[in-house]
Amino acid sequence: MRVGLLGGSFNPPHQAHRAISQFALKRLQLDRVWWLVTPGNPLKENGTLHELGARMQAARDVANDPRIEVSCLESVIRTRYTIDTINTLRRRLRGLRFVWIMGADNLAQFHRWQDWRRIAGQVPIAVIDRPPQSFRALASPAAKALSRYRLPENEAALLADRPAPAWVFLTGLKLNLSSTGLRNPDGSWKGTK
């Protein structure tokens, strides 16, 4: 089975998360996408982070697709960093082929992630374009360091079968939603106050 992993705080989850997942399911020919709702993000201030249970329920409501599974795995296995989550999944679920899914905004700062080179060496990565982040993402330290492992976009369906490091930059999905834009200044979710 080919499984896409979309990690994040989902604070709040929104239609773009579902659209990204459905886009990845189709373009990467995945069987499932797992939303890994993190208990906290080491690169962000977590003061306005809603309770994990509330984010999980909201994510389930938004996902609304049987191929998208919402998980609090990182809380259960007590991992803080993506590399630890990926290593645990690969060790426990050896028969699955994983692809890490991220937006172009995350590629732009991927070099700040804990053990980002090891992440790239453990699992293929699909980067979903998020204009206007395209240039910044493709000019980022991580994109430059991994440039020789980039697949042409027309080979995206082969990504799950490629040994890491391998990555693809997928264009064509035009979305202008972000969790940051859906939060009020006090951290509450817009429309949920």
Swiss-Prot record:
GO molecular function, one term: ATP binding
Known catalytic reactions: nicotinate beta-D-ribonucleotide + ATP + H(+) = deamido-NAD(+) + diphosphate
Domain of life: Bacteria
Keyword Transport in record: no
GO biological process: NAD biosynthetic process
Residue ranges that the Swiss-Prot or TrEMBL entry lists as coiled coil: none
Pathway: Cofactor biosynthesis; NAD(+) biosynthesis; deamido-NAD(+) from nicotinate D-ribonucleotide: step 1/1
CDD domains cross-referenced by the UniProt entry: NMNAT
Pfam (any one): CTP_transf_like
Task performed by this protein: Catalyzes the reversible adenylation of nicotinate mononucleotide (NaMN) to nicotinic acid adenine dinucleotide (NaAD).
Stated name of the protein: Probable nicotinate-nucleotide adenylyltransferase
Native source species: Bradyrhizobium diazoefficiens (strain JCM 10833 / BCRC 13528 / IAM 13628 / NBRC 14792 / USDA 110)
